[in-house]
Amino acid sequence: AFLVRDTSNIQWLTAFDDVFDEEAAHALYVCPDHAWLHTDSRYVTACENAARLKPLEVSAERETHAQFAAKRWGGRPAGAADALLGIEDGVSLAEYRRLQKAFAEADAEEPFVETDGVVVGLRAVKDRYEIARMRGAQSITDAAFEHIVRYMRPGMMERQVQLELEEFMLRHGAQGLAFPS
């Protein structure tokens, strides 16, 4: 099994559009034949709608992501006693300790194995859909650059330019900014 906590990786693995923001309110628990997304009540409706045709179960159970993972681990199929649970290399020490505690409370041995860029490696290979989206994003960026060059005037505050640039990109279809402007 594999536990994913990075929101960008969860978004890529689930292929959910316009569901997640930057808050770390989600955990994805993936097994060979099933996956569960643990989220909080603010996101559950959007996640359930996005998951309708996917082999993914959405849960908003009131428990920590670590407790959720421990519960899923306890319910793994017979014969999986020697299995491991991969965790992302970006998991914080605090999150790791919560996992240890939740698994101890569930009387489960620690099955954790650190992974190194598993999802990042998968994300590096682009399909036609992703390439089309990248081209669309580049078109928005090009148009925004042309607009902002014409918009700027001597004496303007940087903040004015920043807000105009961001607003232009969002008005023209950007879902957000790739990095702060």
What are these regions (language model features)?
Residues 1-10, 139-181:
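Active-site cores enriched in adjacent His and Asp/Glu residues with nearby glycine-rich loops
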Residues 1-146:
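A composition/biophysics-driven feature that prefers long, compositionally simple stretches
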